[in-house]
Regions:
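The catalytic "switch" region of P-loop NTPases
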Residues: 9-10, 144, 154-249, 254-255, ...
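Winged-helix-like regulatory helical subdomains adjacent to P-loop NTPase cores
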Residues: 226-339, 345-346, 373-383
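Active-site metal-binding core of divalent-cation-utilizing nuclease and nuclease-like domains
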Residues: 430-458
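Walker A/P-loop-proximal flanking segment of P-loop NTPase domains
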Residues: 1-59, 132, 136, 406
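Conserved NTP-binding/hydrolysis module of P-loop NTPases
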Residues: 65-66, 71, 75-110
């Protein structure tokens, strides 16, 4: 069977194109050798399950590994510590019962089977007996035992699970005297060390953690450009497309920042839809992805509903160019980072990747489309702004300036400074909707300057949106925009200046530098 790109469940190298995670596994193995208990918390579809699967295979020569998941457990299993203990032992049995010709495993099978038979009628194991079971298992086996539990988020709000963790913690602290697991690894989205952490101010027991013994696995689990290129090399060896592997890997990572699901999803779309392994194919895949309803975006929407403070944070960054100093003690920033929506860069908060950013823009702008005059205006004049498959950007900016001054000219300056760029996003959205995409260059997203890049039918348009701060500041902005044009190999750029000087000159002007030019429109 031919290999394919995988976006669901565990990745298997014989079935799927996947990156090399051997370095990641070796780092976890070193922690296990040191007897560390470990937490792996990353966003949804970040490769946690695949990591645990291949870790178990890597460890099986020197350890007895029980890899279980709470994903399929229903609430009945968490009814009490006794029912949860029984469910854990039962899952351990399911994992080990078919393994043969292994003395250490045979010993473990006997202890587990005897325990289940003893308590099978009530399907409950008292906590003290569960503790004895762990000690007997770890003492009698010929190899150290590692327990990994995936999808622990499903259990995080049950007191029964917290009590089980307290038991494991107690045994860890007394392991010099009482046999216990060599290592326990808990994987999920939420940081299990802050099990009760919530964003809402009325949340209680926020730091009631029974798991402060564990070390977080901090190594980067996103795909580097090198890893993406290695995966594409495997694909190219099979399909002979003639792609420029380094260039394609770089472009994919520009959109995804290496988020595993997003990298694999774009590759899958290009492959299955025959979009072409080139810049245009990637842009087309991005457009398709942003229109999809899938589990990844469903989870994003749910998180925004469940955590309105995070939605406000992301909106402030994207809409208003607000900057935030990254502080891990801030609960909103902590949780947003835990979901992999933001990350820390040089002490500041950044949106994690361009795909998430573009989807967030779509969400936020969609909330306002129906009532937005700017959106209606852009939709009304859409046919005038497209000619022979190209955007007539000069005309778009000129018309927006007229519209903005007509509708918002009487508003307060502070209102316009905060809102102007958002209105332009609403204005441009119906013009390019269904055909193009746009995103904001993260390094320029601040209160005074924002660079918008529009991809439309294979052509890029760069618009610098900024607040007028005087002639010298404006000249620096022009110089920076010319540098961007060089970087993107584009000869024409655009500048949209929001000026509150009553003596401003609203007519568009053209600034030239060699073969390149900038059209500036003042609003």
């Amino acid at each position: 069977m031919a290999k394919k790109f995988n976006i669901t469940g565990t990745c298997y190298p014989e079935k799927h194109y996947m990156v090399d995670i051997s370095e990641r596994l070796s780092k976890i193995e070193s922690l296990i050798e040191d007897g560390e208990y470990i937490t792996i918390n990353r966003g949804r579809q970040y490769g946690k399950t695949t990591t645990l699967y291949h870790l178990a295979k890597k460890l099986q020569e020197n350890y007895v590994v029980f890899s279980i998941s709470f994903e399929a457990l229903d609430d009945c299993a968490f009814e009490s510590t006794e029912t949860l203990a029984y469910s854990i032992v039962e899952k351990m049995w399911q994992k080990i019962k078919k393994i043969e010709n292994n003395n250490a495993v045979e010993c473990a099978k006997k202890i587990i089977n005897d325990t289940l038979e003893k308590y099978t009628q009530k399907e409950k194991i008292p906590l003290t007996k569960f503790s004895d079971f762990i000690s007997d298992l770890c003492e009698d086996c010929q190899k150290p035992i590692v327990l990994t539990i995936d999808e622990v988020d499903n259990a995080s709000m049950f007191d029964s699970f917290i009590k089980i963790l307290r038991l494991l913690r107690d045994k860890y602290l007394n392991r010099n005297d009482i046999p216990t697991f060599q290592s326990v690894i808990l994987a999920g989205v939420y940081d299990i060390k802050n099990l009760k952490l919530k964003v809402r101010p009325d949340a209680d027991h926020q730091y009631n953690s029974p798991w402060n013994i564990a070390v977080p696995f901090k190594s980067d689990m996103s795909f580097s450009k090198t890893q993406t290129a290695q995966m594409l090399t495997d694909y190219e060896n099979d399909h002979k497309t003639g792609m420029n592997i380094s260039e394609i890997a770089s472009l994919i990572n520009d959109y995804t920042s290496g988020y595993p699901f997003l990298v694999s999803k774009l590759c899958l779309l290009i492959d299955e839809e025959n979009l072409g392994w080139n810049k245009e194919g990637i842009e087309q895949a991005v457009k398709i992805l942003l229109k999809e309803n899938n589990t990844f975006f469903d989870d994003l929407n749910k998180k925004l509903e469940d955590f309105p403070e995070i939605k406000t944070l992301l909106k402030d960054i994207l809409y208003y160019g607000k900057s935030f100093t990254f502080n891990p003690d801030n609960k909103v920033l902590n949780v947003a980072s835990m979901f992999n929506y933001i990350y820390e860069s040089n002490g500041s908060v950044k949106i994690s990747n361009r795909i998430i950013e573009m989807r967030l823009y779509n969400i936020f702008l969609s909330d306002e489309e129906i009532s937005s005059i700017s959106y209606s205006e852009g939709q009304t004049y859409k046919s005038q702004f497209i000619e022979n498959g190209e955007l007539k950007m000069d005309k778009i900016l000129e018309r927006f300036a007229v519209h903005f001054n007509d509708i918002y000219g009487g508003k307060e300056q502070t209102f316009r400074e905060e809102e102007g760029r958002r209105f332009f996003m609403l204005y441009i959205r119906p013009i390019i909707n269904g055909t193009g995409n746009y995103y904001i260059e993260a390094e320029t997203r601040d209160r005074s300057r924002t660079d918008m890049i529009i991809d439309y039918l294979g052509k890029q348009y760069i618009i610098e949106m900024k607040i007028w701060r005087g002639e010298s500041y404006n000249e620096r902005g022009e110089k920076q925009l010319f540098e961007y044009l060089d970087y993107y190999r584009i000869n024409k750029g655009y500048m949209l200046s929001f000026c509150f000087n009553k003596n401003k000159i609203p007519a568009p002007k053209t600034i030239k530098s060699g073969k390149k030019e900038i059209v500036e429109v003042v609003v």
